[in-house]
Design a protein with these regions (language model features):
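Active-site core segments that coordinate phosphate-bearing ligands/cofactors
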Residues: 1-168
Length: 168
């Protein structure tokens, strides 16, 4: 329903974002023929719009990653300081402000967005997320920035796969 409501057209892509993502594209039958697009979650005739082949891809974790990091950062507030319960709600906003101020360097921490496995490209529920390049000087905003970049590059990997396969 989200793709139809967003006005999906052949060559376009709709990304429904929440705890995970669902990336939806459509193509004309004559453009796809009997070919199966590799590494995506689903390809079904008429599944999105009648008369078109529907394609579904997505990230197994998106908003879940940010919610996890907020809980991680908020744990001391909730369990030790027993402060205002609304303080935890402020964490992501403050991290965003600080992360935007950080310069881009070759020493930045990096992350993989596979915290719930990988849905697309090439589904594998066994792979795991990762944050690397940490030192004792790494700040919470730097880790948050790495997580944001991981979800952005995870999205890019989906876009690139669909382009490689001639769908979007």
């Amino acid at each position: 329903v989200g793709a139809v409501g967003a006005g999906i057209v052949p060559g376009g892509l709709v990304k429904v974002m929440g705890t995970s993502t669902c990336d939806i594209a459509i193509a004309r039958y004559e453009e796809i023929g009997d070919r199966t697009v590799r590494g995506i979650c689903g390809q079904v005739d008429g599944s999105v719009v009648p008369g078109y082949v529907g394609f579904e891809a997505g990230q197994a974790a998106f908003g879940d990653i940010y919610a996890w990091f907020r809980r991680l950062m908020g744990w001391p507030l909730k369990h030790i300081a027993k402060g205002d319960p609304h303080l935890e709600e402020l964490i992501l906003g403050e991290l965003t402000i600080e992360a935007e101020r950080l310069p881009l360097t070759v020493d930045d921490p990096v992350a993989l967005d596979w915290f719930n496995g990988r849905r697309t490209p090439d589904a594998d529920p066994r792979v795991q997320g990762c944050i690397s390049g940490l030192t004792l000087a790494t700040s919470a905003p730097a880790i948050f920035k790495a997580l944001v970049e991981a979800t952005a590059f995870g999205s890019r990997a989906i876009n690139e796969r669909l382009l490689e396969e001639g769908v979007a």
